Design a protein with these regions (language model features):
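Helix-loop junction within the histidine kinase core
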Residues: 17-28
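Short conserved segment of the HATPase_c
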Residues: 122-136
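Short alpha-helical Gxxx[C/S/T] motif in the catalytic ATP-binding
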Residues: 146, 150-151, 155
């Protein structure tokens, strides 16, 4: 466990250093948001199950699923938030997720992600320093819950680097809700490809005559 923590700490310190020195390069590639969300959900549900925590997707309404952006960093941001929602939750607790989009114009959408947990929440004093490196709620918290104290600073930096925003509401002993908004370009080429495939599939059976042969008079009448 100690070696695992040390490796995680070293990796996150390096990541934080890259973000601060503007060395992190975002991808600009096509990806399917639904497939990405499905991958995240499979991993998170497995982690949650170990503590009897229920994942409830209240809403998923992303119409433009073929987007252009940095899926690797999107995945890391969402995974960080959901992992914390499990880590700081109560046994047999719940996590409520909502994902939807707002279309800004013909070429751009903003995807909104909301994560609400029934966990231990945060004190008002800790809320003011949640994005500070190595911040912890109280002495010994890292021993109890694990983590390096760099997850939230990295998450905030990545969200802002992608042109998005992150905010939260929290009440001690009552849970925390995080809100993330990230803009993406719509991948029109992929949308057109899927539309064309659908048209070809529909055209392939359009106007086809089907002969049904029955040896029973009642079936023939039906």
């Amino acid at each position: 466990e100690a070696s695992g923590f040390l490796l995680e700490l070293v990796n996150e310190v390096l990541d934080m250093g890259k973000l601060e020195s503007e060395e992190v390069i975002l991808e600009e590639r096509s990806f399917n948001f639904f497939e990405l969300f499905k991958e995240i959900r499979m991993v998170i549900e497995k982690q949650a199950k170990e503590r009897g925590i229920e994942i409830i997707v209240h809403k998923y309404n992303v119409v433009h699923e073929n987007l252009i952006g940095s899926p690797l960093h999107v995945k890391r941001v969402v995974m960080n938030i959901l992992t914390n929602a499990i880590k700081y939750n109560k046994d047999n607790g719940k996590i409520f997720i909502e994902v939807d989009e707002t279309q800004e114009d013909d070429n751009r959408v903003i995807v909104r992600f909301r994560c609400e947990d029934t966990g231990i929440g945060m004190s008002e004093s800790f809320q003011k320093k949640i994005y500070e490196p190595f911040a912890q709620e109280k002495a010994g918290a890292r021993t109890v819950y694990g983590g390096t104290g760099l997850g939230m600073p990295i998450t905030k930096s990545l969200v802002e680097k992608m042109g998005g925003t992150i905010s939260f509401e929290s009440e001690e002993n009552a849970g925390t809700t995080f809100y993330i908004e990230i803009p993406f370009q719509i991948d029109h080429n992929k949308q057109c490809e899927e539309h064309e495939k659908k048209e070809i599939k529909e055209a392939s059976i359009k106007g086809v005559n089907v002969l049904l042969a029955e040896d029973n008079e009642l079936n023939m009448e039906i």
